[in-house]
Swiss-Prot record:
Organism expressing this protein natively: Sphingopyxis alaskensis (strain DSM 13593 / LMG 18877 / RB2256)
Function in brief: Together with its co-chaperonin GroES, plays an essential role in assisting protein folding. The GroEL-GroES system forms a nano-cage that allows encapsulation of the non-native substrate proteins and provides a physical environment optimized to promote and accelerate protein folding.
PROSITE patterns, per the entry: CHAPERONINS_CPN60
Quaternary structure annotation from Swiss-Prot or TrEMBL: Forms a cylinder of 14 subunits composed of two heptameric rings stacked back-to-back. Interacts with the co-chaperonin GroES.
Full protein name: Chaperonin GroEL 2
GO BP terms, alphabetized: protein refolding
Keyword Amino-acid biosynthesis in record: no
One term of GO molecular function: unfolded protein binding
CDD domains assigned: GroEL
Principal subcellular localization: cytoplasm
Signal peptide: none
Top EC category: isomerase
InterPro entries listed in its UniProt record: Chaperonin_Cpn60_CS, Cpn60/GroEL, Cpn60/GroEL/TCP-1, GroEL-like_apical_dom_sf, GROEL-like_equatorial_sf, TCP-1-like_intermed_sf
Residue numbers binding ATP: 30-33, 51, 87-91, 415, 480-482, 496
């Protein structure tokens, strides 16, 4: 086991504080509409330019192991904030730095770290309650666009496209962000349930111009196994022909004689039919087939469920208003499944999302949820250069998360004003002792930090502006750093999602309290690299 170096008490906290300051000072310059850029060197290719706090935080690694511990714990604040709310990472970092700095001073002055922590927790609880009281629910499309614009660092085009995407696919829909091959940023939406399987034979095509299969009001057979001959389902096919409606077959595969028979029937015009492979693999395939069955009001033909193909009747088939199939995708529009069954399935998937520990599984479950509940939208981000596209894609991702957060918990005035106004919530707080009171005062001072930093980044005197803002009792009145005006920030469209502000404070206080109550640091001593022996010489 390698030898360790141990630091104690104030020496340990000072080392960590230096690391915290290094990371926070690099991150906080990006805060606000006039935040500065940070340029990050890459081991290959062009350097990366970003205004995204968490991207900067993830790139910082310090040479001193003890300083690096402080920096990494602060990085944890940005990462947690990014995972929970998707935005507000810089605000969380600024708050954490302010709490750690003030807390370290208090502990160095001889106060009990645990009581200081209790005071911080007490103050945070009071501020969170105040934020929840003042949060205003978001419903209008224009408000959603405003939130998205702010999170995208003032990019109005991104705000408009995101609001349009949310409007089309709903709050539960999946919105993915990709890099475009062109200059323009575009939105593409898919209504209904889409899965990535195309037609099994081009002979099924009904629209020769678009090379698509379009089936109106079709029956849908959902089969778990392969279909290699159609003998077992002849009675079913005859019943479908008599009904005069088209048929879509979804199966693990349709091969050989079965596929040939379907193609011949399709070409002769006796049966309007198309076949596609089932989406997914293994257990996920079973779950997705069940989703399709619930959406279309049909049954999955599966031996596990005791349903054999020869016993299937027309009543057991799914139905939909329309099905569109191209060479890569199948889209089912307006399935006739019962709303109560679909809602129950959605609730079940939500439960699985909450309990799963795998990020991959969570992503796949969210895709299934979106296909059942809303739809899918793809935002293709364009730009003149690769560096610009990457930077813009970062901002669109931020804006997407912030917009979802705003719809979830409502909005507050932006620019750090909501935290400034929450100072009043701390006035009536009763502490059990002086050390706890010190913890409350630490949060009181930290709440001013984001507004001050936004003003500083805009080239103004942050401390003076914060003092002026505290003179007003109007909750929404604040400093608009983008225009340099004092105004009603909600009317001006300077708004923050309540969830972003709340989680920023909670995450910052949580990690800062851990740093304040740290009494020892342990790190490996650097290994001495011995010089390589000289090679043997030939004389």
């Amino acid at each position: 086991m390698a030898a360790k170096e141990v630091k104690f008490a104030s020496d340990a906290r000072d080392r960590m504080l230096r690391g915290v300051d290094t990371l926070a000072n690099a991150v906080k310059v990006t805060l606000g509409p006039k935040g500065r850029n940070v340029v990050i060197e890459k081991s290959f290719g062009a350097p990366r330019i970003t205004k995204d706090g968490v991207t900067v935080a993830k790139e910082i690694e310090l040479a001193d192991k003890f300083e690096n511990m402080g920096a990494q714990m602060l990085r944890e604040v940005a990462s947690k904030q990014n995972d929970k709310a998707g935005d507000g990472t810089t605000t969380a970092t600024v708050l954490a730095q302010a709490i750690v700095r003030e807390g370290s001073k208090a502990v160095a002055a001889g106060m009990n770290p645990m009581d200081v922590k209790r005071g911080i927790d007490l103050a945070v609880k009071a501020v969170v309650k105040d934020l929840e009281t003042h949060a205003k629910k978001v419903s209008a499309n224009s408000e959603i666009a405003q939130v998205a614009t702010i999170s995208a660092n003032g990019d109005e085009e991104v705000g408009r496209i995101l609001a349009e995407a949310m409007d089309k696919v709903g709050n539960e829909g999946v919105i993915t962000v990709e890099e475009a091959k062109s200059l323009a940023t575009e939105l593409e939406t898919v209504e209904g349930m889409q899965f990535d399987r195309g037609y099994l034979s081009p002979y099924f095509i009904t629209n020769a111009e678009k090379l698509k299969v379009e089936l109106d009001d079709p029956y849908i057979l959902i089969h778990e196994k392969k279909l290699s001959n159609l003998q077992a389902m002849l009675p079913l096919l005859e019943a479908v022909v008599q009904s005069g409606k088209p048929l879509l077959i979804i199966a693990e595969d349709v091969e050989g004689e079965a596929l040939a028979t379907l193609v011949v029937n399709r070409l002769r015009g006796g049966l309007k039919v198309a076949a596609v492979k089932a989406p997914g693999f293994g257990d996920r395939r079973k779950a997705m087939l069940e989703d399709i069955a619930i959406l279309t009001g049909g049954n999955v033909v599966s031996e596990d469920l005791g349903i054999k193909l020869e016993n299937v009747t027309v009543n057991m088939l799914g139905r939909a208003k329309k099905v569109v199939i191209d060479k890569d995708n199948t889209t089912i529009v307006d399935g006739v499944g019962a709303r109560t069954d679909i809602d129950a399935r959605i609730a079940q998937i939500r439960q699985q999302i909450d309990t799963t520990t795998s990020d991959y599984d969570r992503e796949k479950l969210q895709e299934r949820l979106a296909k059942l509940a809303g739809g899918v939208a793809v935002i293709r981000v364009g730009g003149a250069t690769e560096v610009e596209v990457k930077e813009r894609k970062d901002r669109v991702d931020d804006a997407l998360h912030a917009t979802r957060a705003a719809v979830e918990e409502g909005i507050l005035p932006g620019g750090g004003i909501a935290l400034l106004r929450a100072l009043k919530a701390l006035d009536g707080l009763k502490a059990a002792n002086d050390d706890q009171q010190s913890g409350i005062d630490i949060v009181r001072r930290a709440l001013r930090a984001p507004a001050r930093q936004i003003a500083d980044n805009a080239g103004e005197d942050g401390a003076w502006i914060v003092g002026k803002l505290l003179e007003s009792s109007d909750y929404n009145w604040g400093f608009n750093a983008a225009t340099g005006e004092y105004e009603d920030l909600v009317k001006a469209g300077v708004i923050d999602p309540a969830k972003v502000v709340r989680t920023a404070l909670q995450d910052a206080a949580s990690v800062a309290a851990l740093l304040i109550t740290t009494e020892a640091l342990v790190a490996e001593l650097p290994k001495e690299e011995k010089a390589a022996p000289m090679p043997a010489m030939d004389f």
